[in-house]
């Protein structure tokens, strides 16, 4: 790449699956940092994570070494987290997630997907006043360096889910900005 004049600005771990589940995640990040430092020292390293493995110390330490650890916080309600993110562990809950996110001392980016609709006959809407007020309260505790909000971008396995509108996302972003957060919105 370097010989061809192609220089990456970001090396991103994402895709089909959760990158932090890999048993050698910490070593992979260390190797990536070393390779980046050798060949492309100006490139950032980013990991997009659903936040379900933050309780593993190796995962926490590895994410804290990179420039952009982008961690999901889709709801402050346990029942909604189960609907939206479908965590594997029955013990996964908002309170433990909040504690893990706070451990980063602001060295993280929070990413939240807003949506509404129905899953298995139950209403899903993480844009209610209760949800948004709780989300902003959580952001105040977490103190992320940036907040990214977005909505569904492609076909979902559940047809009854709907995108948040541009107006809804803009209103949520404005509330967070009024609290001092750097917010980016993707429609």
Mark where each language-model region is:
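Conserved alpha-helical substructure of the radical SAM core
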Residues: 1-12, 23-27
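Conserved AdoMet/S-adenosylmethionine-binding subsite of the radical SAM
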Residues: 21-162
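Conserved hydrophobic residues forming the short capping helix/wall of the S-adenosyl-L-methionine
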Residues: 1-2, 36, 176
């Amino acid at each position: 790449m370097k010989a061809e004049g192609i220089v990456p600005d970001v090396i991103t771990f994402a895709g089909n699956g959760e990158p932090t589940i890999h048993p050698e995640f910490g070593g992979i990040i260390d190797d990536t940092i070393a390779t980046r430092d050798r060949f492309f020292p100006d490139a950032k390293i980013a990991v997009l994570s659903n936040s379900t493995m933050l309780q593993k110390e190796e995962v926490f330490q590895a994410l804290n070494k990179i420039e952009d650890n982008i961690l999901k916080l889709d709801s402050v309600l346990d029942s909604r987290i189960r609907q939206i993110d479908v965590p594997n562990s029955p013990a996964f809950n908002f309170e433990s997630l909040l504690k893990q996110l706070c451990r980063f001392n602001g060295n993280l980016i929070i990413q939240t997907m807003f949506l509404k609709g129905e899953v298995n006959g139950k209403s899903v809407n993480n844009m209610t006043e209760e949800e948004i007020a709780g989300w902003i309260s959580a952001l105040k505790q977490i103190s992320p360096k940036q907040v990214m909000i977005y909505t569904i971008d492609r076909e979902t396995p559940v047809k009854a889910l709907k995108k948040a509108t541009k107006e809804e996302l803009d209103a949520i972003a404005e509330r967070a900005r009024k609290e001092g957060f750097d917010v980016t919105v993707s429609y």
